[in-house]
Amino acid sequence: MKKIALKNAARGTAFDYAGQSWILLENDDGRALCLSKVIIETRAFDEGNCNNFAVASSKEYLNGAYLDNLLEDVNGPNAFLTTELDLTTDDGLKDYGTCTVTIFLLTVDQYRRNRDVIPNADDWWWLSTAFSTKSNGYESLARRVDTDGTLDWNGAFSGFDGLRPACYLDSDLLISIEDDEATDDVTPEHAGEIIAALAEQFGGTFATEDQLTTALSFMLGTLRATREKEARHE
C-alpha cells in the first residue's frame, strides 16, 4: 500500500475513508469531490414526494444518522467539508436556490462532468436535481441514474431508487492505495515545474528526442522520490 494526498491522486481513484469506499471525481481549490463507490441503500428521495432536495427526507438522513455513522469511524479530526449545493433544476429554474450540506447527492451537472470516471451501479440511484419545480407544475419528479449510466427521472416518494452519497473532502487528506494503482500522472503544478527545469537546462530546445526523454525521465524520477519522502514524513 502507498499513501498519497488526495490532491495528488488521479480522477477515478478508489479509496477508503470513514468506513466507506469512495471514488475521487475532481479536485478544486483544496476540495476533493468524492462519490460513494456503491449504493448504500434504497430509500425515497423524499417521503413526502417533494423534489426539492433542500427539504427532502434523504438530505436529512444523509446529514443526520448517516453522517454520524461516518464520523464514528474517523480517527481524529475529520476531513468532511460543508458546501453550498446548487439546486438549479434540469430545465434551468432556480426556485429551489441552494442548500448547505456535508453529505449530498450529486447534481446533474456534477454527474455529467465526471461521467467518465463514475462506474455504473447495480441499481437506480438518485441525483439531487429536480426535473422542474412546483411553480412549473412538477413538484415531485427528481432526476436519477439508471444501471447503464443514462439519466432518467422518478417520483420522489419512490423507495426503489438508491442513495449514492457524495461529499467534499479536504484534498490534503492522505489516502492509501495499492502500489500498482499509484499514478505517475503529473499535476499541472508539477508539469510546470518540470517544463521550467527542462527549459532552464536546455535553453528551451532539445538536440534529440532521446535527450528530451532522458531529461524528462530524470525529472519524473526525482518527483516520485520527493513524493515518497513527503509521505514518509507526514
Task: Cite the ranges covered by each PLM segment.
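Short intrinsically disordered terminal tails
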Residues: 1, 227-234
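Collagenous Gly-X-Y triple-helix signature in extracellular proteins
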Residues: 1-189
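N-terminal secretory targeting and juxtamembrane "stalk" segments of secreted and cell-surface proteins
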Residues: 10, 149-150, 195, 214, ...
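C-terminal alpha-helix/helix-terminus motif
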Residues: 173, 220-230
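N-terminal acidic leader/helix
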Residues: 186-203
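Alpha-helical segments embedded in low-complexity/disordered contexts
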Residues: 190-193, 209-224
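Charged, low-complexity interaction regions
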Residues: 202-210
